[in-house]
Amino acid sequence: MMKLYNIYISIAEKSASPSLLLIRLILAYGFWEPAKTKWTDINSVAEWFESIGIFAPKLNAYLSASTEMAGVFLLLFGLGTRIIALPLIIVMLVAIKTVHWQYGFPASENGFEIPLYYIIMLLALISFGSGKFSLDFLIKSFKKQST
């Protein structure tokens, strides 16, 4: 039984990088549409932010749109993953507080379920990094070789 468990653990450990890649791709896809929509009509986003009580709505419209768009590309390529994850978490926390909290948990009712899942995935990327299938890994490998 222990041998079977060890085989299972070995396989699980080898699947870490593909799993981290999948998390990054899902998050990049998830942030793409909101980022694109914000940039398509940033003034409407600022007006909406103002209507829901977000401080400095124009500035925060640009900040959230920029963070999400940067997040899409950085997550896609696995570059600066641990760094971009933190501002994306902040964007999700603000979204939960200002938009989703009042609807409760279920995603089907515009609740905070999906933003919470994003936060959990982003925390995993902060904890484990972007994996072997990333520019972060290539840069780290290159730095090791050059020293």
Which residue stretches match the model-derived regions?
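Extended, low-polarity transmembrane helix blocks
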Residues: M1-T40, K58-S66, A70-T147
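Perimembrane loop-to-helix junctions flanking transmembrane segments
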Residues: V45-A56
